[in-house]
Amino acid sequence: MSLKLDGKKLSLEIEERLRNYILTNKTIAKRNPGLAVIRIGEDPASGVYVGNKEKACSRVGIKSYIFHLKDTVEQKEVEQLLNKLNLDNNIDGMLLQLPISKKFDEQRLISFINPEKDVDGLNEQNIGKLVKNEQAMRSCTPAGIVNLLKSQNIKIEGKKIVVIGRSLLVGKPLSLMMLNLNATVTITHSKTINLNKICKEADILIAAAGKPNLINSSFVKEGAVIIDVGIHRLTSSDKSKTRLCGDVLLEDVIPKVFAYTPVPGGVGPMTVTMLLVNTIFSWQKQFGLSSTLNDLLP
């Protein structure tokens, strides 16, 4: 029977440890950690994601500050807000909820975030440190995947890992993290020739393509580990029902693989949990708190 990598269960376990860590250390810091989230526009999915982050913060004792701006806001106004938050000592972590309208220079806005507060790990300084394998904020989804694998003692070193997708949020930072952990990494994308053949060589296959049910059993070798980063809401043909699915046709691949992540309840919860970890990491550094935070992770 295939092993389900239960991200929801692991995230709740880590959250409990984080909550206790904050309770133990907030008397020294004299305040709880603070996370600022900037949301621009009315994208419904962004609203759900921001709400999930706010609830997770509340569960562990992080104070969340939500800044919901209208689409009519100007680039300069967002930059001014980011600069203000950089200087706010009550804010340990900051993130710009993506995606945002194409009228904004997204990368310029991210570059305005203090690297020490960049809990999404997208600032060029943090990406550069990741390339050099130096300590820095790590992108949340890739870090969540690494910890999910570690929690089940799934070996990364020496393994052939194929990543489908090259986004700045997942594919690129994840590939670098795996390389830093001594895996042999292949990055594939929409222009890759013979994708099926390349994927079938993977000991660990990570699907972050953004295409529902792209990966079936013909892409997967016997005994592989498959990580599904995708999440999509599909509507039935009569439009009466919707259901969530990932990039992987799970019912087709499960009989063939050693381990897999479900959708929902796999990578998603771990992404939010690593956001909490990054925020607390910044808080810990600011106040010189006990460095046992890493001991709370797998």
From Swiss-Prot:
InterPro entries: Aminoacid_DH-like_N_sf, NAD(P)-bd_dom_sf, THF_DH/CycHdrlase, THF_DH/CycHdrlase_cat_dom, THF_DH/CycHdrlase_CS, THF_DH/CycHdrlase_NAD-bd_dom. One of its GO terms (cellular component) is cytosol. GO terms for biological process: L-histidine biosynthetic process; methionine biosynthetic process; purine nucleotide biosynthetic process; tetrahydrofolate interconversion. Its EC number is 1.5.1.5, 3.5.4.9. The keyword Nuclease does not apply. It catalyses: (6R)-5,10-methylene-5,6,7,8-tetrahydrofolate + NADP(+) = (6R)-5,10-methenyltetrahydrofolate + NADPH; (6R)-5,10-methenyltetrahydrofolate + H2O = (6R)-10-formyltetrahydrofolate + H(+). It comes from the Bacteria. GO terms for molecular function: methenyltetrahydrofolate cyclohydrolase activity; methylenetetrahydrofolate dehydrogenase (NADP+) activity. Keywords: Amino-acid biosynthesis, Histidine biosynthesis, Hydrolase, Methionine biosynthesis, Multifunctional enzyme, NADP, One-carbon metabolism, Oxidoreductase, Purine biosynthesis. Pathway: One-carbon metabolism; tetrahydrofolate interconversion. NADP(+) binds at residues 165-167, 190, 231. Homodimer. Catalyzes the oxidation of 5,10-methylenetetrahydrofolate to 5,10-methenyltetrahydrofolate and then the hydrolysis of 5,10-methenyltetrahydrofolate to 10-formyltetrahydrofolate. Belongs to the tetrahydrofolate dehydrogenase/cyclohydrolase family. This is Bifunctional protein FolD. The gene is folD.
